[in-house]
Amino acid sequence: MHVQEAFKINKPLVLEEFGLPRDSVKFTSNTSTVQRDRYYRAVFDIVEKHAAEKGVFQGCNFWAWGGFAEPQHLFWQRGDDYMGDPGQEEQGLNSVYATDSTINMIKEAVSDINQIIQKQ
């Protein structure tokens, strides 16, 4: 519905807050991200296709940046690292850590989308 409405009024959309837990729904930074990387790649492909065809999706914002944080408890407690996941959610649930393979994919997608938009 949002896509059709944005198309009707000629306004861009940003696909935001998409994310997926790490493989086996584990939260530590050493857990693999194969399934999440596939999901992110599919999302980036859609946004890149729309950008190239001057479609409505012109950007995206993943959820959530975990950086160098490391979950210390299942749910946030005073003194724990701040992560992208809110305190009422499992810490590390959707966090993209600075050491994840997902980072390179994000960098490539950002570069590709920027190049497409700059050529228009």
For the regions a language model picked out, list residue spans one by one.
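Glycoside hydrolase catalytic-domain groove-lining segments
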Residues: M1-K26
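Aromatic-rich peripheral "rim/lid" segments of glycoside hydrolase catalytic domains that contact
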Residues: V25-Q120
